[in-house]
Amino acid sequence: MLITNQTESNLKNVLELEVKKIPGMKYVADYLSVNQQEQLLNIIDQQSWSKELDRNIQQYGYTYQHSETGAVVASKHLGNLPDWADCLAKQLARDFPLTSTSQVLDQLLVNEYQPGQGCKSHIDCVPCFGNTIFLISLGSQCVIEFIHSQTKEQVPILLLPGSLVVLQGAARYTWRHGITSSKLDKYQGKEFVRSRRVSLTFREVLFPHK
């Protein structure tokens, strides 16, 4: 299904209600303009991709070891974020002030999802990262599934291109999130065919991992 202006307006109204079911979550459907999205994708695609996972990724700031336990290794500090990423990280911190000690977003994970690819349901490593997680979507729309770790309540959220998700409080620590490995999403009775999607996850690395 193509997302027209009318469809997007209706979806935003639905999403506003759905997001309220997840305490600590903020959703900005059009955080980045179409031009900003295109510029970011162009920059990202000029960088080298790693095939560490079953999908392409890029890591900046610190390397996160993707495993069952997950860890950030201080010895694998990659240096400061590149200018394009640092600029966006500072913008996020201004728009949504951090309450942590350092108040600096210093780790970025870029994921590329081709149609049919997804990620397991998870909570971002609690001892590794601060209390605010930022997720930006570029390219295709996609449904992300939030599951309460205790009640198992499920809340699907449609991530629109250029959208921003902010996870704090219960949304950060109690709700798992993941993306099914599918080429098609169903949301609110409508079908959305996936194309290439790139996500940016900004986080703050905690001591003693630095």
Where are these regions (language model features)?
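Non-heme Fe(II) oxygenase metal-center motifs and adjacent flexible, charged/small-residue loops
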Residues: M1-K210
